Structures are given as structure tokens and as C-alpha cells.
């Protein structure tokens, strides 16, 4: 499929948080080589595939911590809607390549001592990190139908907000989370009672 998109106005949006490969390089005093600068730049997570596959649309890496991939998705949807690109790849990357990750999150009490996530449960004692890479191609629905593409889902609406001032910079705001849900529902022109499944933040 990608070979058919060469030279097209296709965007590339990649959500990522943390930079374990560079962290490991620095911790082990790896000798600097000519590829370290560009090779470790987060922007290259989006720019390299755009370069390699000759994609001409917007190309950017998004880091908004846990929401990175969904914010990348929101930006890609808006870019398609406003004509900045005709379609867009959206990817999410989370690879745990450094022990620093575990040491840090243990030090702030974020990791589950039981090794399990117990969301909305009295047993909740933190979260367990996981790894993965995923990528989807977004197209306007009418074009996907016309092209006979396999359609896995339809994005009806999305929204992005920041929690603003809370107890700490990492503490969520229940009030703002309610606002962003309402905004997403309004954008999608649906009612809350029409929702059949919600995937919540697991921390």
C-alpha cells in the first residue's frame, strides 16, 4: 500500500513518550558518531518514514505523555478535515529499552507492587508498563469506501484539552476530563448513552 502513496500528500503523525534509546546511549558513555544527532532526534520518528516513502504531507512527532498517540490522531484528523493532507498515517510507539524507566517510576510510586493494574478497584496500587508499536492509515470515509479499503473503524469526533492547574503537574483534573469528553461527543454529534465502551487512562 505504501508504495502506491509515493509522492502523495499523505501526513505522518507519531505519538511517543520518553527516549530510552538515547538515555541508554548516554548512560553507557557511547562514543558520539555522525548519526547520533539526527538518529536520536524525536522528530525523525515521523520524518524518516515520510522521507523514505516520499510522503509530502505534514510530518510530526507528538509527545504529550500518556495521551501522545491519541493527540497525534486528533491532529491527523484535523489535518485531513482542513485539507492539509489527503490521508495520514498515525502511529504510537512505546518501547522500554532502559532500566531507567522502571527505576524512575518506582521512585515516584507509580509502578504496581502487585504487578497488575486494578483500575477503579480498591486494590489499585499503580500501573504496569507495556510495550508496543501500532500504525493506522486514516482516510476520509467516502474515499475509503470508493477505494474498497478494509475499514476497521470510523472516527466520529475527537477533542484535546489540558488539565490546567491541579494539585501537581502530573495530577489529572476530573472536571477538565469531563469537559473534553463532552467536547468529543459534541464533535461526534452523539449522546453519552450511545457509548458502548470506554477505555480509560490506567494510571
What are the functions of these language-model segments?
Residues 1-203:
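Condensing-enzyme catalytic core of the thiolase-fold
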Amino acid at each position: 500500500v505504501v508504495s502506491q502513496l509515493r509522492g502523495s500528500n499523505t501526513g505522518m503523525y507519531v505519538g511517543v513518550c520518553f527516549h530510552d534509546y538515547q538515555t541508554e546511549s548516554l548512560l553507557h558513555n557511547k562514543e558520539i558518531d555522525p548519526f547520533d544527532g539526527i538518529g536520536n532526534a524525536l522528530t525523525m520518528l515521523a520524518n524518516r518514514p515520510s522521507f523514505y516513502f516520499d510522503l509530502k504531507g505534514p510530518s510530526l512527532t507528538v509527545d504529550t505523555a500518556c495521551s501522545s498517540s491519541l493527540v497525534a490522531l486528533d491532529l491527523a484528523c484535523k489535518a485531513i478535515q482542513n485539507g492539509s493532507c489527503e490521508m495520514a498515517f498515525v502511529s504510537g510507539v512505546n518501547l522500554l529499552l532502559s532500566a531507567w524507566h522502571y527505576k524512575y517510576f518506582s521512585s515516584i510510586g507509580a509502578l504496581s507492587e502487585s504487578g497488575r493494574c486494578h483500575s477503579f478497584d480498591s486494590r489499585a496500587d499503580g500501573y504496569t508498563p507495556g510495550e508496543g508499536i501500532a500504525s493506522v492509515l486514516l482516510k476520509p470515509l467516502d474515499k475509503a469506501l470508493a477505494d474498497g479499503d478494509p475499514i476497521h473503524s470510523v472516527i466520529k469526533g475527537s477533542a484535546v484539552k489540558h488539565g490546567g492547574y491541579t494539585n501537581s503537574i502530573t495530577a489529572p483534573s476530573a472536571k477538565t476530563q469531563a469537559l473534553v469528553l463532552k467536547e468529543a461527543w459534541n464533535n461526534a454529534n452523539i449522546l453519552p448513552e450511545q457509548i458502548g465502551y470506554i477505555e480509560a487512562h490506567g494510571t
